[in-house]
Design a protein with these regions (language model features):
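Short, surface-exposed acidic
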Residues: 1-2, 129
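Phosphate-handling DNA/RNA-contact segment within nucleic-acid enzymes
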Residues: 3-98
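TOPRIM fold recognition
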Residues: 55-58, 64-151
C-alpha cells in the first residue's frame, strides 16, 4: 500500500514483514526545504525485494519508485540511497543464488560509486554488472527499461 500524508506532503511507502511495520520511506512533494526522501526505521538493514521472487536478475537501485518500475521485468532491491556497506554485501551474498545476475543501476551522477560497488559484489562471488543511463530508472519508459535489461 502507498499512502499520502496531507500534513507532511509526502507519499509514504510502508515496508512490512508479514503484519509488522518495519519502516517507511517517504517522498516529499511540498514547496518547502524538506529533504526529498525521508525514512523511518532501519532502512540499511532491510532487504525489501520487489517483483518476481526468482532472483535470476536482481537490480539494485536508489529508491523504491525506481524499484517498483523495474519490478515489471526483474527482482528489484531499493537501497534507500546510494551506499551499499560491506555488511550488506555479505548478507546479500547469502540470500541470492551465486548464478544470479546482480545489476547496479544508480542515478547517472553515481557512476563511479556504481563501479566501486560492483567490485565489492564481485569480491563476494556475485555476478555484478552496471547499467549507466542518462536518467534515473524511474524516469525511463518501460520500453527503455526493457532494452537496458535485455542486453
Amino acid at each position: 500500500n502507498i499512502l499520502w500524508s496531507k500534513s507532511r506532503e509526502r507519499l509514504i511507502f510502508p515496508i512490512f514483514s508479514e503484519d509488522k511495520l518495519l519502516a517507511y520511506w517517504g517522498r516529499y512533494f511540498g514547496e518547502g526545504s524538506e529533504p526529498k526522501w525521508k525514512g523511518l526505521g532501519a532502512m540499511r538493514d532491510i532487504f525489501h525485494f520487489i517483483g518476481s521472487p526468482s532472483y535470476d536478475k536482481i537490480v539494485l537501485c536508489e529508491d523504491i519508485v525506481s524499484a517498483i518500475k523495474l519490478s515489471k521485468f526483474c527482482t528489484a532491491l531499493p537501497l534507500f540511497g546510494t551506499h551499499i556497506s560491506v555488511d550488506r554485501w555479505k548478507k546479500l551474498s547469502t540470500i541470492i543464488h551465486k548464478k544470479s545476475q546482480v545489476i547496479i543501476w544508480l542515478d547517472p551522477d553515481m557512476y563511479s560509486k556504481s563501479i566501486k560497488h560492483a567490485n565489492v559484489g564481485r569480491q563476494y562471488g556475485m555476478n555484478t554488472e552496471i547499467i549507466l543511463s542518462d536518467l534515473d530508472p524511474k524516469e525511463h519508459t518501460l520500453v527503455d527499461i526493457a532494452r537496458y535489461l535485455i542486453k
